């Protein structure tokens, strides 16, 4: 029996001719990632073990992004811990305020992860890099710390679900709608510890930003990882971002999949996930009258330049509804600068939005947009669990940048087409 794309990458990194679903392996790592929340836990363990060196100072990335700019004394201490560790071990890829960004947008932008590589990060949305044809997955802080020391990690080889994408998305339908539709179809545990392997002619109709969004939320279906085949667009993206040499792996024709699901992109509609799980999806048309208090546009899921362009297109010449709060978070400093140069930030501010420096901030209920009891947010983030963005009695509705921007104008969950009819 042949291997899936994910299995081929893992076999190569375990120096094995082949692997099978369920097999336990030890794989070599190309990149190990930590942030200001998960990093200190690993760093303290490394210090406790009295380890003086890391496996490769060029293959570790440290990105303070969750509570930065520092929101309080405790977060400042966390960032100081990561900063001092980076200095002590001469870590090449430490990104300070002013250069940093939300980690899962920053690393591809910096060319630090490419097709065919294996990456672990102590953050569940590390699966984002599957958009580039890499195997990447989230792990706990101690596994990440061990990876920093040894350059290795053990995995159980995942079984796979194949998603055949066909057709072309309608206007205002994006990668966020695709992945919300899929999660709504299979559930938050529908791909538990499996690889979500996206294939099909429809992929050519998805931008890189769409693909990053889809791979990013694979974990919300319980997946070990999500992965896309490498095509001309992938290669162009990697070259544009000065990426290192890459390796292209392709699934065998006789690879085994536990399920094969076909999604016709042309049939999808703008979609929203109701509280308190990403699987609680409805089309916006089905949503009914859902009044909201706040809109968040940004995050590692939807804070890239394509996302901001779509939101600005909707907000151009319009105003945020009276009594509404709209917060925009470009995912990296480079994206922020590009958005300024393209006039997008001017559009947001004229519309009545507030624009923030890159941070994970409100997504995890950290800072910069916390919800009070009884408040509702339409958000382009990736999770809407109870209390995720603030008070346990608040509600989060997950949606695309287009829907979020339209909702900011109307004060309720809305389709952008309503504003252009």
Curated annotation (Swiss-Prot):
Textual note on the cofactor: Binds 1 [4Fe-4S] cluster per subunit.
Reaction equations catalysed: (2R,3S)-3-isopropylmalate = (2S)-2-isopropylmalate
Listed CDD domains: IPMI
The protein's enzyme class: lyase
GO BP terms, alphabetized: L-leucine biosynthetic process
Any Pfam family hit: Aconitase
Pathway annotation from the record: Amino-acid biosynthesis; L-leucine biosynthesis; L-leucine from 3-methyl-2-oxobutanoate: step 2/4
Listed cofactors: [4Fe-4S] cluster
Entry's EC annotation: 4.2.1.33
Key word 4Fe-4S present: yes
GO molecular-function terms, A-Z: 3-isopropylmalate dehydratase activity; 4 iron, 4 sulfur cluster binding; metal ion binding
UniProt keyword annotations, A-Z: 4Fe-4S, Amino-acid biosynthesis, Branched-chain amino acid biosynthesis, Iron, Iron-sulfur, Leucine biosynthesis, Lyase, Metal-binding
Binding-site residues for [4Fe-4S] cluster, renumbered to this chain: 300, 360, 363
NCBIfam families: hacA_fam, IPMI_arch, LEU2, PRK00402.1
Annotated family: Belongs to the aconitase/IPM isomerase family. LeuC type 2 subfamily.
Record function comment: Catalyzes the isomerization between 2-isopropylmalate and 3-isopropylmalate, via the formation of 2-isopropylmaleate.
Name of the protein in its database record: 3-isopropylmalate dehydratase large subunit
Annotated source species: Lachnoclostridium phytofermentans (strain ATCC 700394 / DSM 18823 / ISDg)
């Amino acid at each position: 029996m042949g291997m899936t794309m994910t299995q081929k990458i893992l076999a190569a990194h375990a120096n094995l001719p082949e692997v099978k679903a369920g097999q336990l392996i030890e794989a070599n790592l190309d990149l190990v990632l930590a942030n200001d929340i998960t990093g200190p836990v690993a760093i303290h363990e490394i210090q406790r073990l009295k380890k003086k060196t890391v496996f490769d100072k060029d293959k570790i990335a440290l990105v303070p992004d969750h509570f930065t700019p520092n929101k309080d004394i405790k977060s400042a201490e966390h960032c100081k811990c990561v900063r001092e560790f980076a200095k002590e071990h001469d870590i090449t890829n430490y990104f300070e305020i002013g250069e940093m960004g939300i980690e899962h947008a920053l690393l591809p932008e910096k060319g630090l992860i490419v097709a065919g590589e294996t990456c672990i990060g102590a953050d569940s949305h590390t699966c984002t890099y599957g958009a580039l044809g890499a195997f990447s997955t989230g792990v706990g802080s101690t596994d990440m710390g061990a990876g920093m020391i040894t350059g290795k990690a053990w995995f159980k080889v995942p079984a796979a679900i194949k998603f055949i994408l066909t057709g072309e998305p309608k206007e205002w339908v994006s990668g966020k709608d695709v992945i919300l539709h899929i999660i709504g179809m299979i559930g938050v545990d529908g791909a538990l510890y499996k690889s979500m392997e996206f294939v099909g002619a429809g992929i050519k109709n998805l931008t890189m930003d769409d693909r990053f969004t889809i791979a990013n939320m694979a974990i919300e279906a319980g997946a070990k990882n999500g992965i896309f085949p490498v095509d001309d667009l992938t290669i162009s993206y990697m070259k544009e971002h000065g990426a290192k040499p890459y390796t292209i792996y392709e699934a065998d024709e006789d690879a085994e999949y536990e399920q094969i699901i076909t999604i016709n992109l042309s049939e999808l509609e703008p979609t929203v996930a109701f509280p308190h799980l990403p699987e609680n999806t409805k089309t916006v048309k089905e949503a009914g009258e859902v009044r909201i208090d706040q809109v968040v546009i940004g995050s590692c899921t939807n804070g890239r330049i394509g996302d901001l362009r779509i939101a600005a297109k909707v907000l151009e010449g319009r105003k945020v509804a009276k009594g509404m709060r709209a917060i925009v978070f470009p995912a990296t400093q480079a994206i922020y600068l590009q958005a300024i140069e393209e006039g997008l930030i001017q559009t947001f501010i004229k519309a009545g939005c507030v624009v923030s420096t890159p941070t994970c901030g409100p997504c995890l209920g950290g800072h910069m947009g916390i919800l009070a009891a009884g408040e509702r947010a339409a958000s382009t983030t990736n999770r809407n669990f109870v209390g995720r963005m603030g008070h346990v009695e608040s509600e989060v509705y997950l949606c695309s940048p287009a829907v979020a921007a339209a909702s900011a104008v109307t004060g309720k969950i809305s389709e952008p087409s309503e504003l252009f009819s």
